[in-house]
Swiss-Prot record:
Name of this chain's protein: Ribosomal RNA large subunit methyltransferase E
Localization terms from the record: Cytoplasm
GO MF, one annotated term: rRNA (uridine-2'-O-)-methyltransferase activity
Sorted UniProt keywords: Cytoplasm, Methyltransferase, rRNA processing, S-adenosyl-L-methionine, Transferase
EC number: 2.1.1.166
Length: 209
């Protein structure tokens, strides 16, 4: 690919990015990413987070979901966040930087959770996309499987789970596994999710031990 083509492609992306209504709105409201609107839309429909709850936020950086979660959970709530990337501090959020796929990071996260059960597990995790579906989709499905496994380890009875999933190979099987673990599972496509994206959010409530 020539430099000229790269420049043209980058310019189109930048134009789309800066013209994006949700990016501008996030900047105006002091939110760290447009992703914050996705969890706000889910919260508006499904009322997952209430004051005093303990929330785990996986794939948290740069912190859009954690910003929303800590506001909803309030002073008596608790938000524990994890990401492989660094994240600037958010008051009320206990952040762990590390690769969630690694056992030592999972152990450190479980230590921070402690003996108390968690009310909500959020996951906006996604792999670095290569553009090759046969590579990207298995990586994405592996992350959501780890997120569901986290639910099995820490979620309280009747707890909630919201997870980003990319439609494709393995999606139906994953949906089945989530339905087996929760009383109710809904598929959400927030308005703030770009229409061309294959991402959807599974919102599961009523965790069954």
């Amino acid at each position: 690919m020539s430099g000229k083509k790269r420049t043209a492609s980058s310019s189109r992306w930048m134009q789309e990015h800066f013209d994006d209504h949700y990016v501008k709105l996030a900047q105006k409201r002091g939110l760290r990413s447009r992703a914050a609107f996705k969890i706000e839309e889910i919260q508006e429909k499904d009322k997952l987070i209430r004051p005093g709850m303990t929330v785990v936020d996986l794939g948290a950086a740069p912190g859009g979901w954690s910003q929303v979660a800590v506001k909803l959970a309030g002073d008596k709530g608790k938000v524990i966040a994890c990401d492989i990337l660094p994240m600037d501090p958010i008051v009320g959020v206990d952040f762990l930087q590390g690769d969630f796929r690694e056992e030592k990071v999972l152990d450190a996260l479980l230590t921070r959770v402690g003996d108390a059960k968690v009310d909500v597990v959020l996951s906006d995790m996604a792999p670095n996309m290569s553009g090759t579906g046969g590579v990207d989709q298995p990586r994405a499905m592996y992350l959501v499987e780890l997120a569901l496994d986290m639910c099995h380890q820490v979620l309280a009875p009747n707890g909630c789970f919201a997870v980003k999933v990319f439609q494709g190979e393995g999606f139906d099987e994953y949906m089945k596994a989530v339905k087996e673990a929760f009383k109710t599972v809904k598929t959400r496509k927030p308005d703030s999710s770009r229409p061309r994206s294959r991402e959807v959010y599974l919102v599961a409530t009523g965790y069954k031990l």
